[in-house]
Design a protein with these regions (language model features):
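Phosphate-binding glycine-rich loop
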Residues: 63-103, 121
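Conserved PLP-binding catalytic core of the aspartate aminotransferase-like
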Residues: 270, 282-306
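Glycine/small-residue-rich loop that forms an oxyanion/phosphate-binding "nest" at active or ligand-binding sites
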Residues: 77, 85-98, 154, 162, ...
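N-terminal "arm"/small-domain region of PLP-dependent enzymes with the aminotransferase-like
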Residues: 1-56, 144
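Active-site phosphate-binding strand-loop segment of PLP-dependent enzymes
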Residues: 126, 130-186
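PLP-dependent aminotransferase class I/II
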Residues: 201-281, 285-288
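Hydrophobic/aromatic residues located in beta-strands of well-ordered beta-sheets
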Residues: 80, 104, 178, 202-204
Length: 306
C-alpha cells in the first residue's frame, strides 16, 4: 500500500477472486463456471460487424437487451437494470439502500463480497448465523428493520429456500429492501421474480455467468419495482453510464432468446450434479441437497489440510 491510500481502503480486506490459471489445461471447478460453450446464437451475435462498432460507445439505456429480458421474465423494461456482472447490480443496491445508519443483514456463511462491500461503503454488517445443518431460518430475518440480502440458492452450501419462505421475509420487513441473489437459481431453485409485482421492497439479482455460459462477458440483471430500478439507475448514471459493452449487450440478448440451448445445458448440468452426488455418497461423503451447479460435501476420512 502507498502512503496515499485512504484510511477506508486501507482497512478493507479485498475479495479474493477464484484463480484463473493460464499456464495449462485443468478440470476447472473453483469458480462454478459452465462446462458448456456459449449458445451458437451468442457466437453469431458477436459478429465481425459488431466488433467493428467497438469504436462507438454502447447504448447506456441497454434498450434491446431490456426488451429481451422483459419478454423473458414477464416484466416491463423499467423493472430491469443490467449490470457489469451481477456483482455490480449488488454493489449498486448496497450503495442505494444502505449507509452508516442503515445496516445490511446477511448470513455468516454466504457470498464473501457482501462483507467486503460493507467495509468499503462504511455499512454496518448484521451477520446472522446459519443453523447447524447449514440451513437458513427465515424467522431470524423477521422484523429486522434493515436491508437484507439472501443468496438463494446459497453459496457455498447450494441450499435453497422455497419462494414462500422468501415471501414471508418480505412480509415481515415491508419497510426495507430484501435483495435475493439468484446467481444459481436456474439449477433447481425457485425464483422470486413472480413476486416482484406484489412486493415493492423486493430486488432480485441474476447473472449470466453460470447457466448462460457468459462469465467472461460480465452481465447481470437486477429486477424489481420500477421505483427500485430507478434508484439503481441513479447510482449507475452517477458512476458509469456505459457500464455494459456493446458485445456483451448483443451476447446477453441472444442468450436470453435461445431458450432451447439454455434448457438443454441446464438440464445436463443438473443430471451431472445428481450423478456426482450419488458417486460421492457411495464413497462415504456427506453431501448437501444442492440446488446449484456445485456440491457441498464433507468426509471423515481426511481433513481439509490434507
Amino acid at each position: 500500500m502507498s502512503r496515499f491510500l485512504s484510511p477506508t481502503l486501507s482497512a478493507v480486506t479485498p475479495y479474493t477472486p477464484g484463480e484463473q490459471p493460464q499456464d495449462q489445461q485443468y478440470i476447472k471447478l473453483n469458480t462454478n463456471e459452465s462446462p458448456y460453450l456459449p449458445s451458437p446464437a451468442v457466437v453469431a451475435a458477436v459478429s465481425e460487424a459488431e466488433v467493428e462498432k467497438l469504436r462507438l460507445y454502447s447504448d447506456p439505456a441497454c434498450a434491446d437487451l431490456l426488451r429481451a429480458a422483459a419478454a423473458h421474465f414477464g416484466l416491463q423494461p423499467d423493472q430491469i437494470m443490467p449490470g457489469n456482472g451481477s456483482d455490480e447490480n449488488l454493489f449498486f443496491a448496497l450503495r442505494a439502500f444502505c449507509d452508516e445508519q442503515h445496516p445490511l443483514a446477511y448470513a455468516d456463511i454466504t457470498y464473501g463480497c457482501y462483507g467486503v462491500w460493507c467495509g468499503l461503503l462504511h455499512i454496518p454488517s448484521h451477520i446472522i448465523p446459519l443453523k447447524d445443518d447449514f440451513t437458513l431460518d427465515p424467522k431470524d430475518y423477521d422484523g429486522l428493520h434493515q436491508t437484507i440480502v439472501i443468496a438463494n440458492p446459497n453459496a457455498p452450501t447450494g441450499l435453497a429456500l422455497p419462494r414462500s419462505a422468501i415471501e414471508g421475509i418480505l412480509q415481515a420487513n415491508p419497510d426495507n429492501v430484501v435483495i435475493v441473489d439468484e446467481a444459481y437459481v436456474d439449477f433447481g431453485g425457485e425464483s422470486c421474480v413472480p413476486l416482484i409485482d406484489r412486493y415493492d421492497n423486493l430486488l432480485v439479482v441474476q447473472t449470466f455467468s453460470k447457466s448462460r455460459q457468459l462469465a467472461g462477458a460480465r452481465l447481470g440483471l437486477a429486477m424489481g419495482s420500477a421505483s427500485l430500478i430507478a434508484d439503481l439507475n441513479r447510482v449507475k448514471f452517477s458512476l458509469n453510464p456505459y457500464n455494459i459493452n456493446r458485445l456483451t449487450l448483443k451476447a446477453g440478448q441472444a442468450a436470453l432468446e435461445d431458450t432451447a440451448y439454455f434448457d438443454r445445458t441446464r438440464a445436463a448440468i443438473v443430471d451431472t450434479r445428481s450423478w456426482t452426488k450419488q458417486q460421492l455418497e457411495a464413497r462415504g461423503f456427506a453431501v448437501l441437497d444442492s440446488r446449484s451447479n456445485f456440491l457441498f460435501a464433507s468426509t471423515q476420512k481426511k481433513n481439509g489440510g490434507e
